[in-house]
Amino acid sequence: MAVSSSNLNELVASHGSSGLIASALVDKVASEQLEEQLNHQRRGLKVYIRNRLDVKESEVIRNRYGGKYDLHLSQQEHAPHGLAGALRLCETLDCLDAFPRTGLRQDLVLDFGGSWVTHFLRGHNVHCCSPCLGVRDKMRHTERLLSMRKAIINDPQTFEGRQPNFCTNPAEKCDVQAHYAISIHGGYDMGFEGLCRAMNAHGTTFLKGTMMFDGAMLFDDSGFIPELKCHWRKIKNAFSEKENASTFTSKLNLAVSGKTLIAFDFENESTMSYIHEWKNIKSFLTDQTFSYNGYTYGIERCVIYAGILTYKIIGVPGECPPEVIRHCVWFPSLKDYVGLKIPVSADLVEWKTVRLPLSTLRDTEEIAMRCYNDKKTWQDQFKIILGVLSSKSSTIVINGMAMQAGERVDINDYPYIGFAIMLHTKMKYDKLSLMYDAWGASIISQWWKAMTKPIRTFVRLVARTLFPTLRPRSESEFLVKLSTFVTFNDECITDMGEVWDVTANAAAVAAWAVSDGKQLVAEKEKALELANQQPVQNDSQPLTTVNLSTQDPPRSVTAILDPENPVVGQAELPEPPELKALSFQTRSPDTRLAERASAMLEYVAYEQQLHQNVISNLQRIWCSAGGDFVTNRLEGNLKFVFDTYFLTDPLVNVHFPSGRWMRPVPAGTKYMVGFNEKGLGPKMDSELYIVNADCVICNSDGLSSAVKALTAPTGTISLVDGVAGCGKTTAIKKLFQPATDLIVTANKKSAQDVRMALFGASDSKEACTFVRTADSILLNDVPEVSRVLVDEVVLLHFGQLCAVMSKLKAVRAICFGDSEQIAFGSRDASFDMRRSTILPDESSTSDTTFRSPQDVVPLVTRMAGKALPRGAKSKYSRWLSQSKVLNSVSQRCIPSVALVDMDESRFYITMTQADKAALITRAKELQMPSSFYDNKIKTVHESQGISEDHVTLVRLKSTKCDLFKSFPYCLVALTRHKVSFRYEFCGELKGDLIALVLATHSPLI
C-alpha cells in the first residue's frame, strides 16, 4: 500500500527521522528503486569492454552509458586510448539503437567510415563504406580480416553463412541505398557538407554520428581533452613544426601547403595520431544547414560529454520557408579567464591574445598600480611586476606539502605578459594625469577640444594607417573579454519547387507501419483459412475456392516516405521502358492482376539486388587483395586474404594468367563467371580473376532481365497444400499430359527426383524437356503450354511463379507444396521482401501422409503445439498416416563426429553447413565413395522434397542454433524417412524441438 506524503510527514514528526517506521519506509523505497534499476539493467544489451580502464575512466563510461546498457568491464587488456575505444563501441550501439532493426522490416543502416568487423561479429544489418585512402586504411583492413578469421575459427557455427558487408568506395560514390546511416568518428575527412552529399547519394534522410569535440578549437591553436587524455594542435602549413622538420615532411608540406590541419595525439601513447583538415572539423562546430540536390540538411548537436559530441543530420525535401537558425558553442571553462594582448613584434605592431586567470591579472595589476613610480626606471617597474606574476603562479611548500598557487604561465609568454601589464599600468597613469589636468582647464579650452575632436580623430586614423608604430594605444588593445559562448546564425532559404507536405508524409509513414501490421494479420488469417479446408480425396475432386480479401496498396502523395517506394527519401526515378507494362499493371483495377505485377516487380528488384551483392562481395575481396580497377594484377598478401575468406566460403579462389588456381577446384565445380578489374562476367584462361560460391551459378542478372520483359499473367493458380508425404509427386504423375503440360520445380534436385519418378531417368532428353526448373524456363526458349504443374511451390517467389506462367502463356497452374515447411527465403536480409507468399485463386488441403511412419504423427503434432503460437491452427494437428511402419525414431548422444555411425545405406541431414562439412570430411577419412558424400549428405534446406528409407539427423554443436527452434526446419528433418530416423547429437541444446519431443516419446504397440 502506497504511503502518502502527509502520512510520511506525520511519521517523521511523531517518531523522528531515526524512528523504526521511518527507517523501514526509507529502506523499502530505496530497495524498490534499486531493484527497478537492476531489472532495467538486466533487460539492457550486454556490452563487454575488454580495455583496461582506471577508476575515473570507468566512471566516465558508466555515467554516459551505464543506464542504457549492461556494461561488463572485464579489464582484460591494455589497449591504445582505451577509454576512447570503449566509448566508440558504445557510441556505435547507441547510434544503431536510434533506428528500427527488428520485426517485419529489416532496415539496412549505412556506416560511413566505420569498422565493418564490429558489425560482422555482432550480426548487424549494416553496410560500411570504408575507403582505402592510404596505407593506414589498408593496415586497418588487414587487421580486421585477421579479427574476422580469428572469430570464425573459434566459432564456425555462429558465423556460418555470414558475410562481411562493406565496400572500399568513398561514401559519395557508393550506390547502396538505405534510409538511415551512422558515422562514428567518420566525418573528420568529409566535413558536414561531405556527409550531406553522401546522404543524398544513398537516399538517406537520417544520420547519427559522433566526433571528438573541444569548443576551444574555435579560438586556440592547441588544447587538451582531459577525459580522453588527448592533446590536439592546429598545424598551419602542414608539417612546419620544428620537431617534425625532415626531408619527407618538407615534401609533404609542399603537397598540402595552404591547408590548416589539426592533429589529435593521445597522452603517453606511441600509436599513430589522427590528422585531419581543420575546415572539415570546424564545419561541425559552425555550420547549421546545407542545401544540395533538392534537399536541405540540418545538423543538431545532441549531447556533449567526455569530449565526445553526438550529433544528428536530418534531410528534408522540397521548399523550406526562410528561417534564421541559431546555435551556440559554449565554453564553461572560460568564465574565470580574461584575454590579455601581448606584443609579438619589436615595433609593437603585431599582438596576440593569451588567456590569463582573472584573479592573477587583478592582483598583479593592483600591486603594479600601487608600486608605480615615475622616478624609477622601466626595468625596476618591470621586475616588480614579474615578481608578483611569479608569486601568483608558483609552487609553495607548506609543512612538507607542495601546493600550486594559481596556474603556471607559459615560459615563452611570461616576460611579455609582464611587459604588457607594465605598459597597461603606464597607460592608465598617463590617462589619469590627463583627466586631472583637464579638471582645472577653462571652458573655452574644453570647447576647443570638443570642436576639434573630429579633426583629431581623422589625424589619428591617418597616422595609424601610414605609421602603425605611431598609432595611439587604447584600453581594448590590452584587455579582451572572453565570452563563455559563441553564437552562429544561419539563414536557411531554399527554393526547390514543390512544397513538402508534412501532414501527407506523416500519414504515409503511418500507412507504411499499418500495412506491415495488416500483412502479419493477413498471413495468420490465411494460414487459419487454409488449415480449415477439406482434404483432397482424389484428382477429380474440385478444388475448394478461397476468397482472397486484398486491398489496394496505400499510395503516398509524393515519393517521399512512400510505403511502396523501396528508396525512402529520394525523388521517384523514371522507370526503364521494360517496366512500363508491369508498372501500369500494378495500377490495374483488377486486384489480382495488380498483386501479380507487384510481385513480379519485387522479384526483379530482388534479383537485381542479389546481382549487386555478388559484385559488391567480389569487389571487396578484390580490393582487400590489393587489386585496382585499372590493371589486371593483385598485390602480395594473397594467401592471408583468401585463407580468411575461405573459412566462410570454401569456393573462394584465384585464377592466375598461367591457368593454375590458388586452391584445388572441387571435383564437379565449374565457375560460370569471375571478377577482375573489368567487372563480373565470363573470363578467359589467360586472365587473372577471382571467384566465390556465387560464381558457380550466377544468373540473377539474367533472371531480372527476363522478367522485366514479361507482363503479369491472367491464368488461374490452384494450390494443393498437403502435409509431408501426401503423394504430391504421385499426383503430378497422374495429372501430367505431355501434349498440354510442363512440370516446373524450384531446384535442380527436385527436378531430378520428378524425372526419375515419371521417366525412370534424370538426364534423358524427354525427361529434361518436360521437367524444368523455374530458372531454366525463364533463361531459355521454351514452347508454350496451357497448363503448368509446379512441385514444391513454396520454395518459389510469387513473382517468379507469375513470370513462369507468363512466359509459357499458361492459362492454369496447379501448384503442390506444404505451406508449413521451409518457404522461399530472401538471401539478402536488407531487402524489404513483402510479396513472396503465393496468392492462389483456389486452394485445397491434404492431411494424409503415405511416407511418414505412425510414430512420427504424434511427434510432429506435439512439436507443432510447442513451436507455433497459442491458438494457431495447423494441418499437422489433425494429420493421419497410412504407413505400415509403427516405430521408426530413435536418438543417441555422441561425443564427437568420429562416433557418428556412417552407413552408405542411410541419408544424412544437418541443420548447418558446418556440420555438413564435418560429415563430408569424416566420410573422406573413412574412404567412402564420393557418390555417397555428394548425394547422401545434405542440409535440411537442401533435403526438402526428398524421400529416403533411412535418415540420420546429426548435430555436432551445443552452441545456440535457432534452426532447431524453427518448426518448418524441424518438420522437414523429421518427415524425410520412410522406415527409420535416428537423431545423433553432441551435448544438450536449449530449445531443441526435436530432442524435446523425442525425450517424451514412447514406442507404439
Swiss-Prot record:
It is a peripheral membrane protein. One of its GO terms (biological process) is methylation. Residues 51-404 are annotated as: Methyltransferase. Residues 72-285 form the Alphavirus-like MT domain. Signal peptide: none annotated. Keywords: ATP-binding, Helicase, Host endoplasmic reticulum, Host membrane, Hydrolase, Membrane, Methyltransferase, Nucleotide-binding, Transferase. The keyword DNA-binding does not apply. Interacts with RNA-directed RNA polymerase 2a. This is Replication protein 1a.
